[in-house]
Amino acid sequence: YATINPSVTGVGTIAATEYDVGKSYTMTTFTYTNEISDGLTLGLIVDQPYGASVLYNGDPAASSLGGTGAELESQALSIIGKYDVNEAVSVHAGLRRQSVEAEVSLNGVAYGGMDYDVTIDKSSSSGWLIGAAYEIPDIALRVSATYFSEVEHSADTTETLPPLGANNVPGTVDFVTPSAFNLDFQTGIAADTLLTASYRRSNYSDLDVVPTVLGSDLVNLNDAQRFTLGVGRRFSDDLSGSVTLSYEPEGDELVSPLGPTNGLMGISIGARYTVGEAIISGGVNYSKLGDAQADVGGNRADFTGNSSLSFGLKVEVGF
């Protein structure tokens, strides 16, 4: 379980409107694993891979982006099998069933005051994942790589665009949620001390959502990369802790108004405690969000000095 609390504020280029667009949200994940035979493990994951909650305050008639916003919700169910080829090498693969729904509003002077709104009904579709891992348990070495396929969706829509006389017009839209690649690494570097690192690339530029009435893309996102580097330390048989740095490189400073940040640098501090058959983990993350400009045919708002504070809690029970 995690709660994410972004502070995303900016100033519009018209009337110096002050925007506060970041809204807090939560994410919940459930995981179950079971060794069903010697060398074969089955896993089940229920999570929320994507989410967004953005709303621009201000009068749409007197501000660049007042009334623009987006709400995105998703759910995913993954069934994953892992097979140990030998003591060092394993392979894993699985299927993912994913649902996505959203509502997007485009308004303000930047959009010509068109007061556009689209509801994208829930769409469910399937994708897959595949990967492999190499490990040497004696030195706590493990390297794993996983590729996640894109997922193709087709959803019913309802659009409203008053300047064209369009009111609750039904339609459909086709889009994909992006493919991604994960690389994870860990190794022991001293007694009771672990070095961790990871890399993730998500191909968000593949996301094109073009509703019929609007006739243009709702969002224009850049591909994202994330690097992490951390150190974990076991203080006793029951207690361990970790510190992890995270980094996302900056891209084009002009970004979609529905995601007005550009890269980040963050730090996470976590602890893990064993109580009988249960393991309780918790942590906090602080991230400095990169400066960005909301782009609608040019810069419409400057976002600087923003951050995000997140808290997480995880409970593992063996039986």
Task: Please annotate each region the language model reported.
Residues 1-5:
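Transmembrane beta-strand segments of Gram-negative outer membrane beta-barrel proteins
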Residues 8-15, 24-29, 35-319:
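Outer-membrane beta-barrel porins/channels
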